[in-house]
Amino acid sequence: MITAVNRPAALHINLAAIKENTRQAKAHLKPGQKLFCVVKANAYGHGAARLAPVMEEAGADGFCVAMLDEGLELRRAQIVKPILVLGLQPAEESALAAANDISLPVSSLDWLKKAEKVLRKEGLQLKIHLAIDSGMGRIGFSEDEDFKAVNEYLQGNDAFFVEGMFTHFASADSADASYFDYQVKRFKHMESLLTVKPKWIHVDNTAAILFDKDVASDIVRFGIGLYGLNPSSAPGSRDLEPAFALEPAMSFVSELTYVKQIHKGYGVGYGSTHIAEEDEWIGTVPVGYADGWIRKFQGFKVKVGDTYCPIVGRVCMDQFMVLLPKEVPAGTPVELISADPAAPNSLRRAADWLDTIHYEVACQFNDRLDRIYDNE
């Protein structure tokens, strides 16, 4: 996908905010803990290759990604610190990971056996992290016998270096800690079965550190908080108060490319879902669902100059229209998303409008949008 650098529309990423969020996370670690910055999904839409060096400078000890290709992107960006892939990869790719010093997760004995054949053929050793499903219902070992079999298989097996063992919490951002406590108990039980001792045991995620969940963890996998967003922000939920302030890093700006007056009874957009009840001023913004600004944003208010104006008519593939209170000139700035968390068009408010979470909104902004990095 071509990035539209010649279009008046861009995501602005505040590097000073990224640095400060990283430093704050680092400062709140317990003695001996390491900070692994989660930059999967293009750093939650913010730009992984550009931000990883900034996080590294601010104190990151390593990085987490979702897939091997994301890890390879970081290596191409000259990142030399540890990289852990969190999602399962084909065993056939184990040699590629090993050759690039990228660690992979393991969830089955069958995968280990397949990977060993690949590694033996290439004469490589792979760093692995044993994934435990302690209650997420996703990847990882959950049955004692399966885990014991893997433990036995790894005894003296030099095709693998057991670098880590980890789990992921389903509800660390919840005020009700009962399921969180259950997962901790389950993980500790699985840990007790392991005689091949990993270098790192890690369970803490963004929510665990922000909300002071007291769990022994060698690594904190810090994700959404890096970008200044509170993980306790599901639609209609009560936000938990984080242990330190977060500074949102993303804003989304464009401008009016066209302004016209329409008369009473005139329709706007596909299906004419907006019909002018009187003579109205309509402005066009060059952003659409092909950029991740989806059709459900119809009715959401964006800031045109100093005024919040509703989106009228259906969002088109490449453009959307807003109802203006009066005639304003083409070229007037339009702020689709504000970095101010209290603004009506913050990422959180946008997520509320879409009945989703701000993770999803940020991640859906794709590579057609230019990303401009400010405050270096």
Curated annotation (Swiss-Prot):
Pfam families: Ala_racemase_C, Ala_racemase_N. Its EC number is 5.1.1.1. GO terms for biological process: D-alanine biosynthetic process; peptidoglycan biosynthetic process. Pathway: Amino-acid biosynthesis; D-alanine biosynthesis; D-alanine from L-alanine: step 1/1. Keywords: Isomerase, Pyridoxal phosphate. Its cofactor is pyridoxal 5'-phosphate. InterPro entries: Ala_racemase (IPR000821), Ala_racemase/Decarboxylase_C (IPR009006), Ala_racemase_C (IPR011079), Ala_racemase_N (IPR001608), Ala_racemase_pyridoxalP-BS (IPR020622), PLP-binding_barrel (IPR029066). The active site is at K40, Y270. Catalyzes the interconversion of L-alanine and D-alanine. May also act on other amino acids. Belongs to the alanine racemase family. This is Alanine racemase. It comes from Lactobacillus delbrueckii subsp. bulgaricus (strain ATCC BAA-365 / Lb-18). The gene is alr.
